[in-house]
């Protein structure tokens, strides 16, 4: 029996049969993995509370096919302290990964970015910058990053004094006169996005709008449950 061992975070879990759980993990070396955690809902394991979201775990598992079986969990760190809206933000990034990652596909650098983002959300005065950086990294990792420096049609450099529109999976191009104002980005904001410079609140708002547009397309227009929880507060 071949046993694999990886650092991982729990993305999603749900009841399975009488005492077990189905768990989706984000593993450092192999990406998203789905497992059966036998007895995971038993009173003994619930009391131990090892397999908790937002905790760096070392997991060992075995099996073939798309659904593996957990052998053991071991916590490597304490649970990242997340409460209130910060907890909802962490749930949001978990749902993004759960929905968008392909099974057992390694994502170079994304695991470390996720771990750093959890810590930043927990400790930052304003967690929005950490959230935008994570979203941008996720979009790039999935292969849908765009060039924030050039007009996709003319090939000319983006200029701070001009306005541009965004085309999904392609990039930015000079604004057309008939386009709605709320779909327009200033060249100044686009260039700041290229540098990940969020010192200006207008840039941060543009980053949120861009990420929401890009992710909505990747999600197929289906709403995120965690976002509904967050906006309800």
UniProtKB/Swiss-Prot annotation:
Keywords: DNA damage, DNA recombination, DNA repair. GO terms for cellular component: bacterial nucleoid. Signal peptide: none annotated. The keyword DNA repair applies. InterPro entries: ARFGAP/RecO (IPR037278), DNA_rep/recomb_RecO_N (IPR022572), NA-bd_OB-fold (IPR012340), RecO (IPR003717), RecO_C (IPR042242). The keyword Lyase does not apply. Pfam families: RecO_C, RecO_N. SUPFAM superfamilies: ArfGap/RecO-like zinc finger, Nucleic acid-binding proteins. Gene3D superfamilies: Nucleic acid-binding proteins (2.40.50.140), Recombination protein O, C-terminal domain (1.20.1440.120). GO terms for biological process: DNA recombination; double-strand break repair. Belongs to the RecO family. Involved in DNA repair and RecF pathway recombination. This is DNA repair protein RecO.
